Amino acid sequence: MVKRAMLITFSVNSEKFESCYERNKFFRKLYGWKQIIIKANKKYVYQREGLLHKVPHIKVDQSSFIVPEDECEKIIKFFEEWTDKVIWKNFKVLLEEDFEEV
């Protein structure tokens, strides 16, 4: 069975971000991040979720991933918020049975 999906690829235009903080904010919202807090000689590790933790996907490359067609609206909406700072494209693809995990 063939499954419809979207390949999404993006490139960050670093000069358009006001600061490194804002650029990191983009990546954290998309991928999530690991937070480590050291307090009273104890180490607390938290995994903060990003958008891709909530959407099934296959990571193709550092800035490319495939999402099911019915889930792509969330991703497109996210990238539209960053359009002036991030160049992105989406392409319709068909996945064969081998990629049913998406």
Model-derived features: positions:
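Short, intrinsically disordered low-complexity segments
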Residues: 32-83
